[in-house]
Amino acid sequence: YVQLGIPTKWESSHWFQRWGKALPRKGEISFLDRSWYTRAITEPIMGYCSENQYRTFMKKVNKWEDEQMNNGVELTKFYFSLSKDQQEIRMKARKNSELKYWKLSKNDEKIITKWNAFTLYKEQMFNQTSTDNSPWVSINSNNKMIARLTSLRYLLIKTEYEGKKILKPTKWSK
């Protein structure tokens, strides 16, 4: 599990090197909470990167991902999609819960007001960075548990590993 946090000044201007260090080595697996794609959506909307940094990222990301895959990295890009209503429900739950209040930041409250901008940047990201070698897999995440199980099931089906068995549907499910 990898969560890099707020980038340093150097990391902000050396974006791919920052994330390259977080990728797994041969025989390892990494799950990234967020990824280099914060540069494609969150950072430009919230003013955390310049327009030039955003455009450079969008221009170079597909080639960088191809290089990683050519070096043996198996890359699966999940986008956990949430409806605006569900996002608002989760924000209210965080705000009003003694167990979840710590999850809520001022940034979260700003983000919900920029839903349309996030939607636009998300669509641009999908259109420009979903490739044959590295497509986006969008998962409905209104139900967290089902979303997590769906993503794990996807990985188990997609990944080759020793002793893998593909179960056939039972008769009643056909």
Predicted features along the sequence, with ranges:
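Conserved nucleotide-sensing/catalytic segment adjacent to the nucleotide-binding pocket
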Residues: 1-58
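Conserved beta-strand segments of the P-loop GTPase G domain that flank and frequently precede/overlap
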Residues: 2-3, 78-81, 138-140
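Switch/connector loops and helix/strand junctions flanking conserved nucleotide-binding motifs
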Residues: 9-12, 38-43, 84-92, 146-149
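Conserved catalytic network of the ASCE P-loop NTPase/AAA+ motor domain
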Residues: 21-25, 67-73, 129-131
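Hydrophobic/aromatic beta-strand patches that form the interior of the parallel beta-sheet core
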Residues: 30-32, 76-78, 137
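A short beta-strand-to-loop transition that corresponds to the Sensor-1 phosphate-sensing loop
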Residues: 34-35, 79-84, 142
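A glycine- and Lys/Arg-enriched "phosphate-lid" helix/loop adjacent to the NTP-binding pocket
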Residues: 43-60, 68-120, 168-171
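NTP-dependent small-molecule kinase module
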Residues: 120-174
